[in-house]
Structures are given as structure tokens and as C-alpha cells.
Amino acid sequence: MSVISMVLVVIVAFLAGMEGVLDEFQFHQPLVACTLIGLVTGQLVPCIILGGSLQMIALGWANIGAAVAPDAALAAVASAIILVQGGQGRAGVDTAIAVAIPLAVAGLFLTMIVRTLSVICVHQMDAAAAKGSFKGVEAWHIIAVCLQGIRIAIPAAALLAIPSSAVAAALNSMPAWLTDGMSIGGGMVVAVGYAMVINM
């Protein structure tokens, strides 16, 4: 992958992280995030297939009360990077789907860290508001939103730092029973996600 493609992938990851809280342009949705990553890396078709499958899973995820849903943005971005770096094309989609689920759950840890840091930003906004500083309030708002973007951009950059040959070797070294199991499990998770939406 070229340096320009890597930079563009990190930008997509940053936008996906910000959109996780802004919800304006939907960059955090798996279908959009994976498609954009596929577009900038030249792997459009496999990434659209991956994004569509992950979207079916994420449709059933929702924040309810204090319970936070798994991180769809991190799952989409990280699994798309693994798919592209693995170089397996459409054949690697099922493995990428299976990898996305634990990544989504792991993303909750990063979400909690960033939301805790955002509390500091809120206190700074309050202090700026007490002084009548509109620019101060605006600056702290931007910082808080950028923290959400960094939450996805840093793991994306870390994955891109791993040589594609190492990712491909790791994926190719998996035994057939494991890849077949991941393929079946990935398909079941998509079906369960869609079934949850139908039941709503």
C-alpha cells in the first residue's frame, strides 16, 4: 500500500471516529467506512462486501441506557485494513468479519477512555463559558470531537504499520478448520444482527 493510501485511510478512520458522536455524514457506518477505505486502497469490491456484511450486524447494535453498543467504527476500519493488508480479496471477507466482532468489543475500552477525557473538556468549556469566552467554548468542543477521531485513527495507523506481508503470512498460516469456522461464525453473526433488526 502506498504512503498516500495509508494517509487517506487514517483520514477516513479519523472521520469515522468523529462521526461516531456527530452522526451527521454517517462516516462511522460500516458500509460507508469500508467503502471509503476500499476506494482509497484500490480494493473497492471486497471492502463493499465487508462493509455490507458488517452493516447488517451493526443494525442490531444500539446504546440503551448506560449500556454502550460495540464500536462499529473501529470494527469497520480495522477489519477493512486487515482485509486489504491480507491481500486475499473476496476470499478474506469472512475472516475479516469474524475479526471485526472482537475488535468492536475491544473498541468499547477506547470509547470509555475518550469519554472520560471528554469530561475534562466539559469542565474547561464551563470555565470558558463563565468567562464569556465563546472561542474558548468552541475550541474545547473541537478538541473533544477530535479526541473521538483520534480514538479510531491511532489503531488504524498501528495496523497500517504492520507490513502487509506479515498480515498475509498470518492469515495464510491459519489452518483450514479455523478459517472455515470463522467463515461460518461470520455468516451466523450477520444473520443474527439482521434478525435482531427484524424483531424490533
Task: Cite the ranges covered by each PLM segment.
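Hydrophobic transmembrane alpha-helices
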Residues: 1-69, 73
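Alpha-helical transmembrane anchor segments
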Residues: 188-200
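Helix-loop-helix junctions within the multi-pass membrane cores of secondary transporters/permeases
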Residues: 93-181, 186, 190
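Membrane-water interface at transmembrane helix exits
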Residues: 16-20, 42, 58, 83, ...
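Structural motif marking the loop-to-transmembrane transition
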Residues: 3-8, 25, 29, 45, ...
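Helix-coil boundary and interhelical linker segments in multi-pass alpha-helical membrane proteins
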Residues: 1-7, 37-48, 82-102, 166, ...
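Short helix-perturbing small/polar motifs within transmembrane alpha-helices
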Residues: 8-17, 59-62, 74-120, 130
